Regions:
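Transmembrane alpha-helices and adjacent helix-loop boundaries
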Residues: 1-165
């Protein structure tokens, strides 16, 4: 489901459904609805990242751990997950960056973030070029910084890893 549809459903649909049931005092703020929407959207992608990371570890690793007498849980904690995390970290950081960019979509429900602030400032000053230029630069600074941090983390987790020729 597209994030904007999910945000509209949670912000407008759920309160309407709850009020139809008979709860007249139910209120859902834009911040809460936006946070729920973004969390549900990112959660689906994160689950897929974790699934793929765990499946990327050779099945023989689990068999070896089990043959040594480790329980399933201990095999996952001590053998599978440490290897899977190495492959998951870049995707997790990438998903974080995507979620940060997705917050701009939530401005349509009044979610207080950078794009919403830009809209308010443009409405008050009528200086669209300057305001949107500053907003774009702010997004770029944050995204470039996060991308560089991701590269450092990626290099650090790959230290000592044998490269296949």
């Amino acid at each position: 489901v597209p994030l904007i549809v999910l945000a509209y459903f949670i912000y407008f649909g759920i309160p309407a459904a709850v009020k139809a049931i008979g709860f007249t005092d139910f209120k859902l703020t834009a911040l809460v609805a936006g946070t729920i929407s973004l969390s549900m959207n990112a959660g689906a992608y994160m689950a897929e990242i974790f699934r793929a990371g765990i499946q990327s570890v050779d099945k023989g690793q689990m068999e070896a751990a089990r043959s040594l007498g480790l329980s399933y849980g201990k095999s996952m904690r001590k053998v599978i997950l440490p290897q899977a995390i190495r492959t998951m970290i870049p995707s997790i950081i990438n998903q974080f960056i995507i979620s940060l960019k997705d917050t701009s979509i939530l401005s349509v429900i009044g979610f207080p973030e950078l794009t919403k602030a830009g809209n308010i400032i443009v409405g008050n000053t009528f200086k669209a070029l300057q305001v949107w230029g500053i907003v774009a630069v702010m997004y770029m600074v944050v995204i470039i910084t996060l991308s560089r941090v991701a590269k450092r983390i990626e290099r650090r987790i790959n230290v000592g890893k044998l490269e296949a020729n």
